[in-house]
């Protein structure tokens, strides 16, 4: 998810907007299947959990109380969250510190670039809420923050993570009749994976690269979020046909400032795509060797690559992908 500054994961707002943010009302709606939808400003979260009814009721209540204060908590530290990660963590809140810790491994390895804690904000928020479901009586739970997912699994539990590869074909009819996924894989309780995240130029975040998507499995959602950002940035090539603009011109409160971000990628020759995705794969393999990720799937136009066989069945069925994300099946 060239030198690789962070992607901005949520447009939280300028410090001068604290009063406005404080007056915004967090909202929650119960969904079919016992799921919950929490929304507050840019945060849009789906929570699913299975287990003892009373335990789940208490977990949902605690998660909601915590959720209501998260946005203002992050806004108060936003000026520091938008600075490049340095040797010593200057942050105070638990989510902000988690963001910094997830990004810290990349501070000296981005070929002259930089990374800010904002690269891990969505996964870190999901992880913060997951703590209320890591309790006796909860069989499994997942917090999906815009496609960045934190997972809890009790002993012998598992969850299937589905892959929807082409956002261009998505329409309202699929919501009524069921979404046809391009593939799925299972995460079991004996696996260390508890986080899934996706980054790419087509998503809601900024990216320096040309990947339609990079989906990462890691030990935590925060780690997956940061790594997906870094790997997606590494899927890159210099070509005049790629449209890039300063991040501050696309969104004036971006933590990336004048860094050029990708806004359009036309169809490119296969040899250029091969070179770009190979660069991203090399980055992903390096991160896996360092223990920062478990697996990664990289997609750019008609080319898919993966770090290992865990994700290969998905990629075999998705060779004409335009964009992808993560979703529970």
Regions found by a protein language model. Give the residues of each.
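Acidic, low-complexity proline/glycine-rich segments
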Residues: 26-39
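Generic recognition of flexible, low-complexity loop/linker segments
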Residues: 34-35, 203, 284
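Generic N-terminal amphipathic, Lys/Arg-enriched alpha-helix
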Residues: 40-53
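A structural signal for short secondary-structure junctions
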Residues: 39-41, 209, 289-292
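Alpha/propeptide regions of enzymes that mature by internal proteolysis
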Residues: 2-25, 53-144, 148-149, 219-307, ...
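A generic structural signal for beta-strand entry/edge sites
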Residues: 33-35, 44, 140, 158
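Glycine-rich anion/phosphate-binding loop at the beta-strand->alpha-helix junction
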Residues: 115-218, 223-224
